[in-house]
Amino acid sequence: MDFTQLDDFAFAYYGLPDQSSLVSLVDQTHTFQSPTAFPQHQAMSGLAHSGLPFGTLPTGNRSQSMEGSKAPPDRTSPASNALEDSTTDEFGLASRNRADGTDLGVKPKEDKADATAAWSGLRTKAGKERRRLPLACIACRRKKIRCSGEKPACEHCLCSYIPCVYKVTTRKAGPRTDYMAMLDKRPKRMEERVIKAISKLDEEVASSVTCPVVKSAIPGTVPSSKPTKKRSAEEAFGPDLETWAKVPSEPKIEGDDGSSSLQVQGKEGNKLQQEGTEALPSQEIQEHLAELFFDNICGQSYHLLHKPSYMRKLKNGTLPPVLVLTVCAVAARFTSSPLVNSSRPEFLRGEEWASHARDICTRRYECPNLTILTCLLILGLHEFGTCQGGRSWALSGQAIRMAFALQLHKDLEYDPSGRNGTKTQLSFIDREIRRRIMWACFLMDRFNSFETDRPMFIREDTIELPLPVKEKYFQFDMPAPTEMLDGRVPHPPSPKDGQIADTRENMGVAAFLIRAIALWGRIITYLSQGCKDLDPNPLWEDKSHYMKHLNDIVNLEASLPLSLKYSAENLEVHKTEKTPSQFLLMHLCLQHNILFVSRAAMSARKQHGVHVDFFSEASKRTFNAANRISELLREAEQSGCFVSAPFAGYCAFSSTTVHILGIMSRNPSMKLTAQANLTTNVKYLHKMKKYWGMFHWMVENVRTQYRNVLDAMRAGANVEERATQPSFLQYGDWFNRYPRGLFDAEFMDPATHKRKDSGADGVLEAKPELRSVEEYFTLPTPRRVENKDTIRAAAPKRKQSAKKQTGMPAQPGQHLDSLQIIEPDAVSQEHKFSGGLGLQITGVAGFNPLAASKTQIPDFSTTMSPMSPANMTPFAQHAHTHTFFPPELLAMNFGQGSNGNTDPLDRQLIYGGYLMDASTGLGDGYTWAL
């Protein structure tokens, strides 16, 4: 037979080497019959092998459609592997039962009842055996007949030789509406029906007019002809959301996720552990300065660092270098070691280490951590001592923001910076360190904000922390509950804990010092920041805020435990615990609060309705508090304790202003007491100015106040009126006095202002460069320096002439004659001010204070001021002059005044050194016992 006549036939799998495998495949897939049921297939297999090459298939059938060709629709289906039946077989081979469908791989009709369906092995979502066909093909659905469900072709499609296609849908099989959602919608539907019915009744009542009105029906009243069938949100969008969730994520940008940021912080932390190593001093100096830090800084200014942990890490070399540099910088001012000693003043010795630490902290302002925060606090104190007002103010603000960012104002049990959601429980030492750092920020805010234009940032109610425990509990890791700032107990002790039940006994010097400074902050807000003017009641009324603050001061001192009340025995106990300076500082602050409030009451002396008893009591409290401060300083000196906190120096300064007025009293006992106490205070202030630069200004202010009071007494002025002036020197005024610190190592006068940058006011309104006629005559003409070399050459000549005059033997009136450049106005006032700067109250002649106040001012206007707050020995060139004040001021000998004359340099320092009226700082607030 010629095979070329079989063009319209397509035989599947002609090139198969073994038909038995094909038969076995059909059996396993559909009928599970033995290969012996198809003998004709084996015969045809042999012909197929002989007629066509191995692996070749006719190409004519590929171009035909599935419907137009008699070939099976799918070559991959089991039905395409079987040959045609005998009606279309031109080979004449006999076949048995070829029309029953067994050659197509389906079960015979007689076996339909016994065989199981192909989809019977499937399971439902609930896990039960499936009994119904899950999905019919398109052809069976169209003809509304039962589909057998075989894939890829069902029985009906195979018999009809039509393509069998199953519709693929992404919608999950399930009910169209959720049953619970339907129940939820029922009340809403009933409510809508009731509203519609009520609206219809209202319309019928309103339409009483007989004329026809054509109007449209109310939306919703007419039933819609088309039923609305809506799917639930889960049914409609569930598959899409599931598909969107399974989409692989896009490549992440570097640094976009939280883990990368944590890795960056980890790298910064590792870098922080190494940065600054090259600037560290030797190990011996580090340990020496660390001991000085814990003796003079920690516990007095701020309560920072745990000494056992710090010293252990310092010896092991595991501390961050920036922290070591900061501690060395602030402690270097207290050392006398030749390894640290330098030609610079004591308060500038650690500036080199501070500059390195400051640069490291500035580069890490966006990564808050406890190490950087502690360094900012200590550096702010160091800049405070070097007269860097603006820098100290900025560092304090940065530290406060960082403390709140670290959640230090909350008493947390777990570390909030735990990575990957892990919670690390904090130990007692770590929790106490966090509390003390936050309280240090609170104290720094009170110290730096003591001025009218610098309000406080931290409110008392924002700190939800207990006060620090006793120092020995902190050092030896002994947990103990304490009170909060307002007196509440956040964690009451239980008998099972084994802790001390009395929370007040657990509170040491640090806790009550914080309460004293907090009360001082409230007093500042009332007196200096406008709250006094808002008080509806006068000061002497019981309902006034002034009386409330006064009662708070008295109650705070009365609430001290017995171990914290001042006595010689308690001072010795604190010396054994190495906390005597803290103990003395706390009592200095308590007495200063009394002095500050009582002195402020003198400003209302001339108000209408003032009681005399009110001022007499205020005067008594003021003088007693000033005397008590001097007694504490004297006892500290006798016991070998040095209170090095800067605020203690301001307490001494406030006490000194009261003693200056006490010296002028007509009461002999008050006068003698004031003389002795003034001597103690002046010695202490001179000792403090070695370590804190701003006390140079305070010492000179005290000297100016003293001599101005003498001048006023000689001029016949009423000292009582001067004593009641409302303005006085404040602790925060040094910010304006030294906004940028010392300008160079030669100690230029810090009062000289830095030249303003031309672009500093670029965003403000343009100022005209021309001046009016009035400004031309009233304002000074700017000086033009044409020959700078001549001026520079003249300066050494003036210095040489000054040295020659200094080296000459002093004779009566010689200094006065050499320095007097008397103007006509000064001559006219000579008889009025017959007294000079000598300390004799009467009988002093031959000296003109106005002349002394104007001597050599032109010389010092272009050169360095003779008195600078950085100059440690301003009177070193006078061998006969005391290094503190003139001998007369310390000896308080009013009978001897060195012929009423003082050294020329001293007169220049007092009257020409500062351009300010020091009379406003005269210890106001004291009335005299005449």
Curated annotation (Swiss-Prot):
Binding region for DNA: 137-164
A Pfam family it matches: Zn_clus
PROSITE patterns named among the record's database cross-references: ZN2_CY6_FUNGAL_1, ZN2_CY6_FUNGAL_2
Cellular localisation: Nucleus
One Gene Ontology molecular-function label: DNA binding
Induction and repression of expression: Exclusively expressed during infection of common bean.
InterPro entries: TF_fung, Transcription_factor_dom_fun, Zn2-C6_fun-type_DNA-bd_sf, Zn2Cys6_DnaBD
Name under which the protein is recorded: Zn(2)-C6 fungal-type transcription factor FTF1c
Native source species: Fusarium oxysporum f. sp. lycopersici (strain 4287 / CBS 123668 / FGSC 9935 / NRRL 34936)
